[in-house]
Amino acid sequence: MKLHELKPAEGSRKVRNRVGRGTSSGNGKTSGRGQKGQKARSGGGVRLGFEGGQTPLFRRMPKRGFSNINAKEYALVNLDQLNVFEDGTEVTPVVLKEAGIVRAEKSGVKILGNGELTKKLSVKAAKFSKSAEAAITAKGGSIEVI
């Protein structure tokens, strides 16, 4: 085998279909757009969700609920994520952000009880679940709501 004998694998390089280049190509004349009509024109076509003038599905369905502008969204942290810290560390939202455990503090940090805590930590957060509170104090750590 020589360099000039190298060829790409069968079917690995598909030839681009050039439309509107003669009838024998199979996509000449109307370029695969059929005859006249909205979809045959340049820039033609209907918008997303258009159903031909019939009331579209999204307008037939009733509206429901609302978004509470006063809702608080907490950054959630589970107990097993706190095991990255050394024994006796004071864990605050700023420390959690620096460690890359939370991206943004949002309305504060809430500690949840999923997983197992193996270290004695002093944790400061906006909220604690009951199971997280129990697990932290059981390991001899302390909690503080800020």
Curated annotation (Swiss-Prot):
Annotated stretches, region: Disordered: 1-59
Keyword Phosphoprotein attached: no
InterPro entries: Ribosomal_uL15, Ribosomal_uL15/eL18, Ribosomal_uL15/eL18_sf, Ribosomal_uL15_bac-type, Ribosomal_uL15_CS
One Pfam family from the record: Ribosomal_L27A
Ranges annotated as biased composition (Basic and acidic residues): 1-13
Comp. bias intervals (Gly residues): 23-35, 42-52
Origin superkingdom: Bacteria
Keywords on record: Ribonucleoprotein, Ribosomal protein, RNA-binding, rRNA-binding
GO biological process terms held by the UniProt record: translation
Record-level GO cellular component terms: cytosolic large ribosomal subunit
One annotated GO molecular function: rRNA binding
Task of the protein: Binds to the 23S rRNA.
Complex formation: Part of the 50S ribosomal subunit.
Recorded family membership: Belongs to the universal ribosomal protein uL15 family.
Protein name: Large ribosomal subunit protein uL15
Organism whose genome encodes this protein: Streptococcus agalactiae serotype V (strain ATCC BAA-611 / 2603 V/R)
